Amino acid sequence: MFSSFFGNTCSWVFIFIIIVDNEAFLHFSCLIFVFINIFVFLRGVKDIFSFFFLTRRFSFIVVIYYFFLVPRDQLRISRLFHKRQILCKDSRQLMTCSLGLFFKAQINIFLPPFALTVVQFLVNLVCHT
């Protein structure tokens, strides 16, 4: 019940922020990633299906955001855990980078630090080549 309400509320808030302010969307999405991870950690494994439902809905909104509302020539996305910016050459590379960041955000409480380092290396390799 709470997960469904939370998912619907987040979806509408994401859409509103995308329309109003692109930069705020990036920062707000990072906060939501952190909140969802804490929520899953506190609720335990029994609520993992609600977690995947929320992330699937959010990833759909991210796809809409990147392909329809962002200019295609030079696209900037904020890193989730660093203040530096990465510059993507085209929409395909942007989508690869954003999916990598999205994947890294979802596994940060499930994998040890070494695995996160490997994921970070792969994201950097894809985004800077």
From Swiss-Prot:
It comes from the Eukaryota. Keywords: Membrane, Transmembrane, Transmembrane helix. The keyword Transmembrane helix applies. It comes from Saccharomyces cerevisiae (strain ATCC 204508 / S288c) (Baker's yeast). One of its GO terms (cellular component) is membrane. The keyword Metal-binding does not apply. It is a multi-pass membrane protein. The chain crosses the membrane at residues 15-35, 48-68, 107-127. Disulfide bonds: none annotated. This is Putative uncharacterized protein YGR114C. It is found in: Membrane. Coiled coil: none annotated. Partially overlaps SPT6.
